[in-house]
Amino acid sequence: MTAASSLHPPAIPRVGFVSLGCPKATVDSERILTCLRAEGYLISPNYADADLVVVNTCGFIDSAVAESLETIGEALTENGKVIVTGCLGAKEDVIRQAHPSVLAVTGPQATEEVMAAIHHHLPKPHDPYLDLVPPQGIKLTPKHYAYLKISEGCNHHCTFCIIPSMRGDLVSRPVGGVLQEAQSLVEAGVKELLIISQDTSAYGVDIKYRTGFWQGRPVRTRITELANALGEFGIWVRLHYVYPYPHVDELIPLMAEGKLLPYLDIPFQHANKRILKLMKRPANSENVLVRIQQWRKTCPDIALRSTFIVGFPGETEAEFEELLAFLEEAQLDRVGAFTYSPVKGAAANVLPDHVPPEIQQERLERLMQQQEIISKQRLAVKKGQQLRVLVDTVDEEGAIARSYADAPEIDGVVYINDASTLKPGDWADVRVTDTDIHDLWTEKI
């Protein structure tokens, strides 16, 4: 090494990163960022200072495709060197047609391919003594909660969805690896784990629920056994994307025991048997209502969230009203709904009798108006109750927290009027003073 080179060592390469899409994509981004930091790359907060930019895209619906393509274009304009990954990356021709100058394109869950592309265009720094990576990896979420992905892909072929064609069939992570990651997160200060996958309740079915090992003891690769083990960490464990298999009923006693949060994110999608069959979804709303009653009997505090599609091809007014009747009887706590939108490659596109957009929108508004009344009534009974909440943010006006019934970003929040002694990540015991459609207002106890 010459004197000049020792005085002016090579600059550490910087990578810009943009993460779009759902929590599953967020976990993919976290894995790539963790690898980058482990190899000594710096993460640039802006395009200008980056040597190249990675864009993790979403391609689920048309608006997501448009946002992804726009973001790629922005990164090319501001930086010029862009690597594309994620769900839209499974359609390389779409990306290349819009932006032929991108350096490389990979599909989702392709950490090794992304890193190989980065190495090719921006060689990694050489400093074996530099330890940049915390044990829990690089996270895009606040320090007190984290998403934990337990599998990739999906074995279902719902006619409105193209995720299996982008992310492949179900591949479950080894149960020991999942629990090791959970332990690392807990040791790093995480107080809430949000368990995610394309189909959380199918965990282990691809490997016939093979028995794995965790700290020397056997644990089946199955959602009930995994949930039971996660419950031993003594933190909040929240389940998302739970397909309504019969064995989901086994999870409710764990919620009643306090091992899992009494919260179930379970997408029913519709209530009419014919529409559900066209969707290739479970088609027995009567059985669903019986199960909901049993869940509430076993765990009275359970909060139920679901999603629904309105205006699916062929949906009649009577079939839509059947969905409204189901919602009235089910009395779900949280509901998300959207109008059916044709997605390139989805089997439902070829179904006859597509519902006109204006009728779709009218039905969506009717559904949400009805559900708002239900949600408001279900929250109103909490007035005067005491709750333990997890604080997300604090400012001069107070604190914003979440209860067991509130997942980050998709549900309501809990406002605390006095935040003088609180900081993000704190637990707080509060009393509910007021409620509305989605949120609670509280005072510290």
Swiss-Prot record:
Record's GO cellular component terms: cytosol
GO BP, one annotated term: tRNA modification
Subcellular localization is given as: Cytoplasm
Q: Which UniProt keywords apply?
A: 4Fe-4S, Cytoplasm, Iron, Iron-sulfur, Metal-binding, S-adenosyl-L-methionine, Transferase
Q: Does 4Fe-4S appear among the keywords? A: yes
Kindly report, in one word, the top-level EC class recorded for this enzyme: transferase
Q: What is its EC number?
A: 2.8.4.4
Residues given in the record as [4Fe-4S] cluster 2 binding sites: C154, C158, C161
- Catalytic reactions of this protein: L-aspartate(89)-[ribosomal protein uS12]-hydrogen + (sulfur carrier)-SH + AH2 + 2 S-adenosyl-L-methionine = 3-methylsulfanyl-L-aspartate(89)-[ribosomal protein uS12]-hydrogen + (sulfur carrier)-H + 5'-deoxyadenosine + L-methionine + A + S-adenosyl-L-homocysteine + 2 H(+)
**One matching Pfam family:** Radical_SAM
Residues forming the Radical SAM core domain are 140-377
Superkingdom field: Bacteria
Q: Name one GO molecular function term.
A: metal ion binding
Q: Which Gene3D superfamilies does UniProt cross-reference here?
A: Methylthiotransferase, N-terminal domain (3.40.50.12160), Nucleic acid-binding proteins (2.40.50.140), tm_1862 like domain (3.80.30.20)
- Residues that bind [4Fe-4S] cluster 1, according to the entry? C22, C58, C87
Question: Does Protease appear among the keywords?
Answer: no
Signal peptide per UniProt: none
Q: Where is the MTTase N-terminal domain positioned along the sequence? A: 13-123
Q: How is the cofactor bound?
A: Binds 2 [4Fe-4S] clusters. One cluster is coordinated with 3 cysteines and an exchangeable S-adenosyl-L-methionine.
Q: Which cofactor does it need?
A: [4Fe-4S] cluster
Q: Where is the TRAM domain?
A: 380-445
The family this protein is said to belong to: Belongs to the methylthiotransferase family. RimO subfamily.
Q: What does this protein do?
A: Catalyzes the methylthiolation of an aspartic acid residue of ribosomal protein uS12.
HAMAP family found in the cross-reference section: MTTase_RimO (MF_01865)
The entry's protein name is Ribosomal protein uS12 methylthiotransferase RimO
Q: Which organism is it from?
A: Nitrosomonas eutropha (strain DSM 101675 / C91 / Nm57)
Gene field: rimO
